[in-house]
């Protein structure tokens, strides 16, 4: 069974975008390429347990094992040495990517307090969208009682669109609630 967001993309979004931007081929229509979830855990320098907990939560949210990221260079001001584990990231593609995006749009974002839509200024000029989440509690997989500390995470939605306008039309079609 195909994911409902993928079906919506194929049946509704592709024809709408083809009409709006006059694409000559269905293959020219932009699509979501991958979603990268990143959780930077600065306190992992002094407390290794916090990184384990963050990675565990990221695995619950994404449904796949996160990659532990390490510091590229030493920064004395942050008491950071090169090669020390300071974060975790997950790259979602295919079915898991559509499942996560569907869950993000329909369940998680509406749970954000005082939510008026995601900002429209977070496109990078190449058709990719970046979204910061202040707390991991908005995701239904995270049990409120098991959380030791609220942590934020970055969500990067990478699309094959060439412009921000095309990317915004794609994400709007997929149900992303942009602020008016």
UniProtKB/Swiss-Prot annotation:
Q: Which SUPFAM superfamilies match?
A: RL5-like (SSF55282)
Report the InterPro entries cross-referenced here: Ribosomal_uL5 (IPR002132), Ribosomal_uL5_bac-type (IPR020930), Ribosomal_uL5_C (IPR031309), Ribosomal_uL5_CS (IPR020929), Ribosomal_uL5_dom_sf (IPR022803), Ribosomal_uL5_N (IPR031310)
Record keyword Ribonucleoprotein present = yes
**Keyword Ribosomal protein in record:** yes
**Keyword field:** Ribonucleoprotein, Ribosomal protein, RNA-binding, rRNA-binding, tRNA-binding
Q: What highest taxon heads this organism's lineage?
A: Bacteria
According to the UniProt entry, its GO molecular function terms are:
rRNA binding; structural constituent of ribosome; tRNA binding
* Classification via PANTHER family: 60S RIBOSOMAL PROTEIN L11-RELATED (PTHR11994)
| NCBIfam families given in the database record | PRK00010.1
Report the family membership: Belongs to the universal ribosomal protein uL5 family.
This protein is called Large ribosomal subunit protein uL5
| Biological source species | Streptococcus pneumoniae serotype 2 (strain D39 / NCTC 7466)
Question: In the record, what lineage is assigned to the organism producing the protein?
Answer: Bacteria, Bacillati, Bacillota, Bacilli, Lactobacillales
Gene it is expressed from: rplE
């Amino acid at each position: 069974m195909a994911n409902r967001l993928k079906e919506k993309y194929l049946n509704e979004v592709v024809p709408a975008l083809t009409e709006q931007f006059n694409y000559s081929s269905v293959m020219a229509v932009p699509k979501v390429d991958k979603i990268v979830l990143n959780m930077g855990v600065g306190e992992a320098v002094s407390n290794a347990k916090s990184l384990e907990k963050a990675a565990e939560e990221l695995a619950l949210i994404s449904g796949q094992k996160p990659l532990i990221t390490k510091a590229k260079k030493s920064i004395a001001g942050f008491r950071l040495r090169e090669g020390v584990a300071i974060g975790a990231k997950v790259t979602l593609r295919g079915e898991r990517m559509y499942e996560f995006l569907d869950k993000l749009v329909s369940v998680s974002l509406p749970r954000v307090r005082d939510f008026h839509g995601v900002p429209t200024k977070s496109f990078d000029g190449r058709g990719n969208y970046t979204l910061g989440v202040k707390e991991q509690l908005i995701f239904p997989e995270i049990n409120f009682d098991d959380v030791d500390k609220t942590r934020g995470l970055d969500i990067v939605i990478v699309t094959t669109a060439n412009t921000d306008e095309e990317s915004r039309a794609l994400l709007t079609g997929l149900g992303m609630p942009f602020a008016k």
